[in-house]
Amino acid sequence: MDSQRNLLIIALLFVSFMIWQAWEQDKNPQPQQQTTQTTTTAAGSAADQGVPASGQGKLITVKTDVLELTINTNGGDIEQALLLAYPKTLKSTEPFQLLETTPQFVYQAQSGLTGRDGPDNPANGPRPLYNVDKEAFVLADGQDELVIPLTYTDKAGNVFTKTFTLKRGGYAVNVGYSVQNASEKPLEVSTFGQLKQTAALPTSRDTQTGGLSTMHTFRGAAFSTADSKYEKYKFDTILDNENLNVSTKNGWVAMLQQYFTTAWVPRNNGTNNFYTANLGNGVVAIGYKSQPVLVQPGQTDKLQSTLWVGPAIQDKMAAVAPHLDLTVDYGWLWFISQPLFKLLKFIHSFLGNWGFSIIVITFIVRGIMYPLTKAQYTSMAKMRMLQPKIQAMRERLGDDKQRQSQEMMALYKAEKVNPLGGCFPLIIQMPIFLALYYMLSASVELRHAPFILWIHDLSAQDPYYILPIIMGATMFFIQKMSPTTVTDPMQQKIMTFMPVIFTVFFLWFPSGLVVYYIVSNLVTIIQQQLIYRGLEKRGLHSREKKKS
């Protein structure tokens, strides 16, 4: 094996990855639900949970430094959410809209009190029409907390207060309930939180950048239970009426898309029922319903829940609920992507630039792998030294393939050469490369993150294709500097075009990934020269000009 054949191996791995990615996007089987129970139900099965449909009421606006919400006083649902710190597109001044209610698309965070005596129970009539003292709430300068109380009094005189509390700089919305029983019998109520969304995503709301090499992150529902940290639940599964129905303590339910998460977190010590539902008209839902609570006559009880509505910032989500940070979809290489991101974030805390942080992490990764790289080049050098003996053996044995194989293995053993030694470092490097790919595609911190000069978004492709061309040039240089024993004309042609093929591949890759590969190639050039000098001293390498 020599460096040029290694390029061929890498290319084959890339092609395999692209084919696998396309297949996964098309087929993507449902993850195994080991701790859940699924039931087939009819459309609109959220009603079976005592969860109401939306209604018409007065719309009030709530604005903090990072969030702008629209709340419908009919039920107190959040019908719109704007993320003020995250523009819709790189050059846009319009904030990204996470929650939306239009005739074409619905994405809402519903909540309330259901159960036997809950005002949101459809059996008790229309949803409660809350009273509020003003139509706009704005977090003032110097104010750290914004409180929005909604009040409803039923026919029996029972007072239900639903209070939204938002903090400066936060995407966690506390939703509290106060139930004041003015009747002569106990009130039985349960809290619920439900996320509903149109399964088909309009093009205008798609956060995927598109292109041949775009990593399509998971969009759908997810949940966490006491027995399972994180489970995905596809929208298509809900549309097929294969619905989730599981009871658990703690946990959360969520809806995910690239970079952003919405999640309900129950705040109680009892058991909660997690469910999904096909609401009809292409709208799906995931939600929870808490264990019933009895409020005695003349008593007041308080209940709590938390809504996360915003960017998928891992450390902040983990502080809201255990394992909520797992909603950042790093795919099947999450166990590499997560520590890689933590290291990248640590470096960024010093440098303040994600591009330079990627460069530093490249040096760290390649430094750690230097012993393997050295072993790779040593193995390839030994293989080249054995070529005359191997060629003589092949001429001597003719077409006897079995004896050729036996004597070749004996030769490798005698010379202490591992024929696969040149491949092992490549096998190690590919998962790291792909993990970085996942990380760049799923981490909101890298969305619209600028580097230098013309690179204004490391998560998107280079708009002028300069970085891929530079990357191809570094590959070409490595190829020219590497000795070869390849004599087959077809292999020689393939290897000659390899830098061009890779350049085409990388045209649509995230800029941050191309930066990583360019720096990695530059490190390879440096390490290559250092290793060759050592091999020359051992008589395993010659500075003779590479034959073209």
Swiss-Prot record:
UniProt keyword NAD, yes or no: no
GO molecular function annotation: membrane insertase activity
Biased composition range(s): Low complexity: 29-41
Gene3D superfamilies, per database record: 2.70.98.90
GO BP annotations, alphabetical order: protein insertion into membrane; protein transport
Keywords: Cell inner membrane, Cell membrane, Chaperone, Membrane, Protein transport, Transmembrane, Transmembrane helix, Transport
Principal localisation: membrane
Keyword Membrane applies: yes
Pfam families reported for this sequence: 60KD_IMP, YidC_periplas
Subcellular location: Cell inner membrane
Annotated transmembrane regions: 6-26, 345-365, 420-440, 458-478, 499-519
Segments for region (Disordered): 28-52
Highest taxon in the source lineage: Bacteria
GO CC term, one of those recorded: plasma membrane
Membrane topology type: Multi-pass membrane protein
HAMAP family noted in UniProt: YidC_type1
Primary role: Required for the insertion and/or proper folding and/or complex formation of integral membrane proteins into the membrane. Involved in integration of membrane proteins that insert both dependently and independently of the Sec translocase complex, as well as at least some lipoproteins. Aids folding of multispanning membrane proteins.
Subunit structure as annotated in this protein's UniProt entry: Interacts with the Sec translocase complex via SecD. Specifically interacts with transmembrane segments of nascent integral membrane proteins during membrane integration.
Family in the record: Belongs to the OXA1/ALB3/YidC family. Type 1 subfamily.
Protein name: Membrane protein insertase YidC
Name of the gene this protein is made from: yidC
